């Protein structure tokens, strides 16, 4: 069998092209080899979903005055939304509606899917409240257990036959602790003895165990010293890559770099798209 000699082939798309002197018949091929330059087809998927609030109004039972009036906004998945405005304007009320703690008087809160052409793919689905996590301002006021483990597993299923769910929650717990930096905290420690920053981390971990589609935070930096504020802001930057965040805050400077969309709540419960004033 003859041996062909290659002369310094030049790679094209990772494949060396043989020189013109190369004969495929020398190694037993019946047809000459043909080398074609081919490009991998580009597959672009732009499908995405948004959490959409559509013309939502809210009037507390037994009253005649709306706290929220015709609120509309759309928040794309895995993005960071910020709502700011004066105290008493209705920001926290809106968060409570999103979390399912109250129901809108009118309007809807839904998840809308979109195709790569930017058009709605189908009718929207109502936002399931079990897929929404909320961390209130000063969350330590809502702690109920005397150790970290009992606090984070409070509300887990206790009945027989729930082993598979418990195993999934345990796996989620390990991931949540890693995400928020609690893996070095003793599980038998009283959560009320944690620093302010670590109390916020614990409150975040409790919600993350449930793998929410939307995580809502009400004043996440309030009452923290400068170092804890910086740590929580850094944590939110990481979480933004994993899930959708909606934050109500007066601390605009620390959060401005994270914001993808922002709105100002005006007195009277009207929401207006606006960049945070710095």
UniProtKB/Swiss-Prot annotation:
Subcellular localization: Plastid, Chloroplast
One annotated Gene Ontology cellular component of this protein: chloroplast envelope
Entry-linked SMART domains: AAA
Keyword Repressor carried by entry: no
InterPro entries attached to this UniProt entry: AAA+_ATPase (IPR003593), ABC_transporter-like_ATP-bd (IPR003439), ABC_transpr_CbiO/EcfA_su (IPR015856), ECF_ABC_transporter_ATP-bd (IPR050095), P-loop_NTPase (IPR027417)
Transit peptide: 1-49
Gene Ontology biological process terms in this record: chloroplast organization; transmembrane transport
Domain spans labelled ABC transporter: 51-278
Family from the record: Belongs to the ABC transporter superfamily. ABCI family.
Protein name: ABC transporter I family member 11, chloroplastic
Name of the gene encoding the protein in the UniProt record: ABCI11
């Amino acid at each position: 069998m003859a041996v062909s000699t290659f002369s310094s082939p030049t790679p094209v798309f990772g494949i060396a092209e043989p020189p013109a002197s190369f004969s495929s018949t020398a190694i037993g091929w019946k047809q000459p080899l043909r080398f074609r330059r081919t490009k991998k087809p580009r597959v672009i998927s732009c499908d995405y979903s948004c959490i959409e609030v559509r013309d939502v109004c809210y009037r507390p039972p037994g009253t005649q005055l709306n706290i929220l009036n015709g609120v509309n906004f759309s928040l794309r998945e895995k993005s960071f939304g910020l709502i700011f405005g004066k105290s008493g304007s209705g920001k926290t009320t809106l968060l409570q509606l999103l979390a399912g703690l109250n129901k809108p008087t009118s309007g809807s809160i839904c998840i809308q899917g979109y195709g790569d052409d930017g058009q709605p793919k189908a009718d929207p689905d109502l936002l399931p409240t079990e897929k929404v996590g909320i961390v209130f301002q000063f969350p330590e006021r809502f702690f109920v257990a005397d150790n970290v483990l009992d606090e984070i597993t409070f509300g887990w299923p206790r009945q027989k036959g729930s082993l598979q769910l418990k195993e999934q929650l345990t796996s989620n717990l390990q991931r949540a602790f890693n995400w928020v930096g609690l893996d070095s905290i003793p599980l038998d420690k009283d959560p009320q003895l944690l620093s302010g920053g670590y109390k916020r981390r614990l409150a975040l971990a409790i919600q993350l165990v449930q793998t929410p589609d939307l995580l809502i935070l009400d004043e996440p930096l309030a009452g923290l010293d400068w170092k804890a504020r910086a740590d929580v802001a850094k944590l939110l930057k990481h979480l933004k890559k994993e899930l959708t965040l909606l934050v109500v805050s007066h601390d605009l400077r620390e959060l401005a770099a994270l914001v993808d969309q922002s709105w100002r709540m005006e007195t009277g419960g009207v929401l207006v798209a606006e960049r945070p004033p710095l």
